[in-house]
Amino acid sequence: MKILAAMSGGVDSAVAAARAVDAGHDVTGVHLALSRMPGTLRTGSRGCCTVEDSMDARRAADLLGIPFYVWDFSERFAADVVDDFVAEYQAGRTPNPCMRCNERIKFAALLEKALDLGFDAVCTGHYADVLPGPDGQPELHRAAAWAKDQSYVLGVLTAEQIAHSYFPLGSTPSKAEVRAEAAARGIQVAQKPDSHDICFIPDGDTRGWLADRVGAEPGDILDGEGNAIGTHQGAAAFTVGQRKGLAIGTPAPDGRPRFVLEIRPKDNTVVVGPQEALAIREIAGSSYTWAGTPPTRPDQPFDCDVQIRAHADPVPARAAVSVVDGSMQLVITPRDPLHGVAPGQTAVVYAGTRVLGQVTIDRTVSAVADARPPVRDAGPADAAPAAAALVGATAGE
């Protein structure tokens, strides 16, 4: 096959490209320039896509003897990932920028350009696997290295995108083996640290970064009855499940600690309550996709596992596509309550190791009655109350 290897400058993508060459494919390397000011995108081991990373990728490509290019995707990345991240937070939702990048950049803009240029597939260093299904169609599966599995952040891929994706690291037992292989091949980045968190916020100060862009306005902290029990200096400074730093002047009647349950940008309030009020018994959303043929017909429930964070444990659940409030939604009911779930997060559904699809969460239903004041759903077009807990996930390579 003619393969376009996306090379981030890290060890995973370098070894993935090397394995593609070993497999006899016609490989070309490409590094994505995602910022016009790449020096701002790294602090120590945090961040990615800097000039240093581009040079590391070029050196790896030269070692492998493959052509190498740098493509400027900075404008598309700013519009589809960074601006989306800010807009979602302003709407009180919890975006996952790594999934947006996979959905709109690596397996959309990059893949589209690759196919236009005659490539058969895009190769990345993600820890996931593409395997043939019973009908011969490619399926997206978890990686053999469960601790490094990145199938969650690839859950946004459609069947067509999966058919043009190549993940050579999928069957690798561990990251240590990848590093050892890189060292044996003479790849200079064999011991380069993994990138973490959000690449365009390399210092990890998401609250400060957001405050610089959306401002910080004081507002009320509410209890479950809607009573104002304190004030905050900016809702973006809080995350769902947070306990420390609430600075509540009125203690709880039962003396128990309180946790952030929701952030409500429409009226600039933060709702707090007991820890058990974080439990969620149902999630749903209208923005869903399937990684192949839908598992059932609409209104026909199916068993699955649901995962709501990149490295969270999957939870057994029942799911169905149903009409809710006039729109088709994927509704998921976990066997046991989920905790700290926020609108804007992504729920990926699995059948064993296979990714079935995903949904962006618009609505959550508390497992605890009367735990919060009345709320409105936070759909994509409505900046309504919602939680704003940031879910960090490594971006993959």
UniProtKB/Swiss-Prot annotation:
Record-annotated site: Interaction with tRNA: H126, Q345
Transmembrane segments: none
Chain intervals for the UniProt region annotation (Interaction with tRNA): 148-150
Keyword list, A-Z: ATP-binding, Cytoplasm, Disulfide bond, Nucleotide-binding, RNA-binding, Transferase, tRNA processing, tRNA-binding
Keyword tRNA processing: yes
Keyword Translocase: no
Cross-referenced PANTHER family: MITOCHONDRIAL TRNA-SPECIFIC 2-THIOURIDYLASE 1, TRNA 5-METHYLAMINOMETHYL-2-THIOURIDYLATE -METHYLTRANSFERASE
A GO molecular-function annotation: tRNA binding
Protein origin, superkingdom: Bacteria
EC code(s) of this entry: 2.8.1.13
InterPro entries from the UniProt entry: MnmA-like (IPR004506), MnmA-like_C (IPR046885), MnmA-like_central (IPR046884), MnmA-like_central_sf (IPR023382), Rossmann-like_a/b/a_fold (IPR014729)
The reaction(s) this protein catalyses: S-sulfanyl-L-cysteinyl-[protein] + uridine(34) in tRNA + AH2 + ATP = 2-thiouridine(34) in tRNA + L-cysteinyl-[protein] + A + AMP + diphosphate + H(+)
Binding site for ATP: A6, M7, S8, G9, G10, V11, D12, S13, L32, G125
Group of enzyme by EC: transferase
SS bond partners: C101-C199
Residue positions of the active site: C101, C199
GO biological process: tRNA wobble position uridine thiolation
Short name of any one Pfam family annotated for the protein: tRNA_Me_trans_M
Protein function: Catalyzes the 2-thiolation of uridine at the wobble position (U34) of tRNA, leading to the formation of s(2)U34.
Family assignment from sequence similarity: Belongs to the MnmA/TRMU family.
Name the UniProt record assigns to this protein: tRNA-specific 2-thiouridylase MnmA
Gene Ontology CC annotations of this record: cytoplasm
